[in-house]
Amino acid sequence: MEKHTMYYDMLVRVTNAISQCNDPEEVALVTAESVKTGFRAKGCSVFLVDRDTREMGLAASHGLSREYLDKGPVRYMQEIGEAQDQVPIAIYDVQDDPRIQYPEAAKKEGISSLLGVPIISHDKVIGALRVYTSEPWEFSMQDITLVQAIAQICGMAMDMCRMYKGHKTSIEILKNLRGKEYYKSRGWTPYEGVPISVAR
C-alpha cells in the first residue's frame, strides 16, 4: 500500500507540474526533472523524433552530464527500440545488452539500468522517455506502468501546448491583417441583442 501511495503521489505531482507549462520545451524539462526526482534515479531524458533525420533529438534531461548527452546521435530505428516498437524496454545491465548504442559512454557515466518508454500522441510515436539508474534495477510492472502513464501525459501536454501556441499565433496574424481598431472594445454587454425594455 505504501508503494501504491508513492506512485499515486508522484503521478499527481507530475501532472500538476506539467499542467502549468506553456510550451513543449517546458513540458519536456518538467517531465525529466519530476521523473528523476520521483524515482530517485540517476537521470531522466526526453527525446523527440526528427522525422527527417530519423534520429531522436534530446528535448530535455536532468541528472546526466553534458559529456554523456553529447555522446552521439540516437538512431530512431536502431537503438533500444522503445519508440520504433511502441513498447517499453527495460534493460537491467546496459553493459551486457546489444541494444545499447553507446555502452562505453554509459559505463563512464555510471549507468547500470535503463527504462525506456515511447511518448505517443494521436496514436503516433513522437519520442521516448528514459529513466537511468546508477544501481542495477529490476523495473517492476508498476514502475513501467507509471512511467508509461507519465509519458502519455507528456505527449498530450506537448500536443496541447503546440495547439495553444498555434492558436495564439493565428489570432495575432488576424489582428495584424484586420487592424487593431477592429478589436477594440465596442461596449458589448451581457444584454447585447436584447430589447432595452427587457434588459431593464
Task: For the regions a language model picked out, list residue spans one by one.
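Sensory-domain boundary capping and coupling elements
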Residues: I119-T133, A157
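Signal-transducing coupling segments at domain and membrane junctions
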Residues: R66, Y92-S113, T133
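Acidic/proline- and glycine-rich, intrinsically disordered low-complexity segments
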Residues: R66-I89, Y102
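Allosteric cytosolic regulatory segments
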Residues: Q148-M156
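A short, aliphatic-rich beta-strand micro-motif
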Residues: S112-I120
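GAF sensory/regulatory domain recognition
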Residues: E33, S45-L69
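Signal-transmission linkers at sensory-effector interfaces
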Residues: M1-E26, G166-G193
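Regulatory loop-to-helix N-cap segments in sensory/regulatory domains
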Residues: M1-T5, Y132-A149
